[in-house]
Amino acid sequence: MKLAVIPGDGIGVEVTAEALKVLGKLVPDLETTEYDLGARRYNATGELLPADELDQIRQHDAILLGAIGDPRIVAPGILERGLLLNMRFQLDHHVNLRPAQLYPGALSPLAAQPEIDFVVVREGTEGPYTGNGGAIRVGTDHEIATEVSINTWFGAERVVRYAFALAQTRSKHLTLIHKTNVLSNAGAIWTRAIETVGAEYPDVETAYCHIDAATIYMVTDPSRFDVIVTDNLFGDIITDLAGAVTGGIGLAASGNIDASGTNPSMFEPVHGSAPDIAGKGIADPTAAILSAALLLRHLGREDDAARVEAVVAADLATRGEGPISTTEIGDRITAAL
């Protein structure tokens, strides 16, 4: 397995090291190449994503990312657009995969729920994040700004197809979340994609939920969801809520996936770089380790992925409230494998 590693900034470096321990234990032929991308690199050289390094990254089987950003040295927005979004578009990471599972011992406002275990499949390369828009008369009382949301049949259909295939392996239930009663043009594409692809999956039950209602149900009745498919903007919102109800984004893993397999997919914890605690050895690497499990599953190593998730669940259940270091968590999980 050839793995491109981007530790990034802050605690990204620390949690990535623990995820690599886990991968090294399970993958004897693991080959890693580290790429120094992020706030430190940009602050020192002005480089965000050099073309030659992106070409090198393309040659790997997958990418493991830590966390990017440090507002103390790089203004917000520069790295998000110039590095993260740029990489997403360049590598056609059209599926953003966000599992949401409430593990034993996780602190959640919904801890009394019998079970929370669903997955959000978010479209990753369209919607209002394509940079299609602009502003005129800036700074005047007549300023006008537009952000155009791009929705294509090609983009929606391939993400919906991925979601149906995933639902087939789980509880065979798929929910489309959108706002079709107001966003009728984009909504029509997504609805037609569900109907068209759904005809190929007759045993997968489908449902529809408006985005505003979905935020209520995710808090009051999360067990109604198994696989959720949605567009880029709604997915951005709903996945953070999913993280909150399952113990916080500190436990949330994610995958940015090119479902065609043409480009390597990237896996990362959802949390940020937290420069205020970097170097203190107190960052929780659980999300990075669960992201490594997603990476293993994506590359066809289902048994290894399931082992990691089971060990993480057992570790969380016995962790308690006392302080525990980043490396200790990584060592315990690695040893238990």
UniProtKB/Swiss-Prot annotation:
GO terms for molecular function: 3-isopropylmalate dehydrogenase activity; magnesium ion binding; NAD binding. One of its GO terms (biological process) is L-leucine biosynthetic process. It catalyses: (2R,3S)-3-isopropylmalate + NAD(+) = 4-methyl-2-oxopentanoate + CO2 + NADH. The record marks 129, 179 as: Important for catalysis. Gene3D superfamilies: Isopropylmalate Dehydrogenase. Substrate binds at residues 88, 98, 122, 212. Its EC number is 1.1.1.85. It holds the Pfam family Iso_dh. It comes from the Bacteria. Disulfide bonds: none annotated. Its main location: cytoplasm. SUPFAM superfamilies: Isocitrate/Isopropylmalate dehydrogenase-like. It is found in: Cytoplasm. Keywords: Amino-acid biosynthesis, Branched-chain amino acid biosynthesis, Cytoplasm, Leucine biosynthesis, Magnesium, Manganese, Metal-binding, NAD, Oxidoreductase. Pathway: Amino-acid biosynthesis; L-leucine biosynthesis; L-leucine from 3-methyl-2-oxobutanoate: step 3/4. HAMAP family: LeuB_type2. Belongs to the isocitrate and isopropylmalate dehydrogenases family. LeuB type 2 subfamily. Homodimer. This is 3-isopropylmalate dehydrogenase. The lineage of its organism: Bacteria, Bacillati, Actinomycetota, Actinomycetes, Mycobacteriales.
